[in-house]
Amino acid sequence: MSKQQYRLGIDAGGTFTDFILADHQGNVQLFKAPSTPHDGTLAIRNGLAQIADALGRTPAEIIADCDLCINGTTVALNALIEKTGVKVGLLCTDGHEDSLEIRLGHKEDGHRYDATYPPAHMLVPRHLRRPIGGRIISDGSEFSPLDEAAIHAAIDYFREQQVQAVAISFVWSVRNPSHEQRAMAMVRAALPDVFVCSGHEVFPQIREYTRTSTTVVNAYLSPVMGRYIERIDALFEELGAQQPTRYFQSNGGLAPGVVMRERAVNAINSGPASAPQAGLCVAQPFGIDNVITVDMGGTSFDITLSKGGRTNFSKDSDFLRYRIGVPMIQVETLGAGGGSIAHLDDFGMLQVGPRSAGANPGPVCYGKGGVEPTVTDANLALGYLADGALLGGSIRLNRQAAIDAIRSKIAEPLGISVERAAVGIITLVNLSMVSGIRRVSIERGYDPRDFALIGAGGAAGMHVMRLAEEIGSKVVLIPKVASGLCAFGQILSDIRYDQLTTLPMRLDDEFVDLEQLNQALQQLRERGMTNLRDDGFGGDNRIECQYSLEIRYLGQIHECSVELSCDRLDRSSLAALRESFHQRHKALFSYSEPNSPVELVNLECSVIARLQRPPMPELATPLKATAAIPAGHRPMLFNAQDDWQDTPVYNGDRIEVGQIIQGPCVIEEATTNILVPPGWRVSLDPSATYELTPGH
């Protein structure tokens, strides 16, 4: 860190906005404020006021003393989910107006052959997709000139329709962007207040549908993201921030607002994408680099997998039914949070989620007007949370209200007890989360028994051990800052810019053009370095370039991404690259064809400026071991067939390093509870992380 004292991470979630403040002495503090979806700056102001009160300083003094303020946000994600983006017009090559609906000729995976599955909502209605004459062909040459009269006509129509953003995507613009560049200039000149983006800039790789879809999503979200960034930047400027606010990207890196307001598609997973970085940091003191990080907040349940210290990425994938081409940390998101609503479906079956009570009105026990029981209400009814406890330091829980809601909405209609209904709610939400974990592990060739489970989010501590039992994980790690782990991950992250290009080329020795290939790698690297310099980084920072090549067997239509360990290829490293591709193909598809020719399709280069991390917490180890003493006991129910148990409750602030506590018990931290079920034990590590393992 620099001479400034603090680094601040802010994660704006659906229910709470989390603040992590770290200083240069290893102190990490967590604060929470209820989210304000209508204006994110209100939650940030409230959180900064809490921090100021705790430190005896003003918000302006704290911000002025921060070397970096980082914001992860769900603004872009929520706009895509709720369809609250802006009105978009599309300029496309004549004859390609329907590519968004034709897609790849089928629906997304999981519904490919389901004739009853409805088509995705189109972000650009048919009448706003305007065909433009002119054609670039695959070698980059102009087959026919751009029809500027058609562009003028489209501009007039967009003006009449009050379009707020224009996406431009022409065929083969990745080989020659001149037509897109001319169209952009014309639209910007005629419609100066309208946001404009083009496919060759947003996603400069082949495949028309993916490029068009990604560009349209970017146009749909960027004005929304831009307004949010404008308010946040103004707030921090008002408070005297020494550096521009950095925003967390879906690729796990940071970028300034001036970049993110133009590339909102890179912020779709801005919130949950920081969790795996934090998960790896939490696991490091234990010598673990295979982790599955699960983040259960009030609204959703996010799952990421990291193997060997590297987090899985997705690219060219369907996200909320829209094809997104840009690289993103692979996050599996479920509608399973503390605020997920339990209800009976049309057949009288108990269901949990995906609807959520959110921050307002929230669960019934919040006393803010909620009437439908949630997962949090069930946890409170079963004794895992304390009646009258302050959630997040500000919301007092009402157990009787939770019990009454479960009785009237679930138990009585089903003819069962409140206890059985509450256990059923917890069981169902756990099964849903286990299914999600299996999708990111077993279905992608990973054995979850080889991974530690990292619990993040305010609600995860009450569920994660049951999830570990189901998937066979033998280690669960829950840091004291678990409920703010995404904000914690933000302060550990680096500046990152991804550069992409397409370069079709046979990789056989007799066909490959190493000079052209190395020149393309150098150009990507230089573009990324330019981005870093424009962002004010690159001088004193350690720069790292990570390369990956998308390769396939000749004639295939999909590629495998293979990492390149050098920044320049020769004959020897080319042979090693081909062998790495064969191995990767076999790992993914169970076979390889070493004697078949292979071809390169795409190149990627991630240019990263490594930032100095703030030091991590280090708790003192007592000279003499003592037994942990419960702060009290309360009845809890762990199974519908069992009796209530008088269960010890421990105050997390009084647990010392090295003390081993046997379950069942609950550990109460300021912003989360950890449920240790029967058959598990827990101890506190000097890194301020609870380690939970099965056994006595």
Swiss-Prot record:
The keyword Nucleotide-binding applies. SUPFAM superfamilies: Actin-like ATPase domain. Its EC number is 3.5.2.-. Pfam families: Hydant_A_C, Hydant_A_N, Hydantoinase_A. GO terms for cellular component: cytosol. The keyword rRNA-binding does not apply. Keywords: ATP-binding, Hydrolase, Nucleotide-binding. GO terms for molecular function: 5-oxoprolinase (ATP-hydrolyzing) activity; ATP binding. Belongs to the HyuA family. The tetrameric structure and the presence of a connecting tunnel suggest that the activated lactim moves from the CapA active site to the CapB active site without release to solvent. The caprolactamase is a heterotetramer composed of two alpha subunits (CapA) and two beta subunits (CapB). This is Caprolactamase subunit alpha. It comes from Pseudomonas jessenii. The gene is capA.
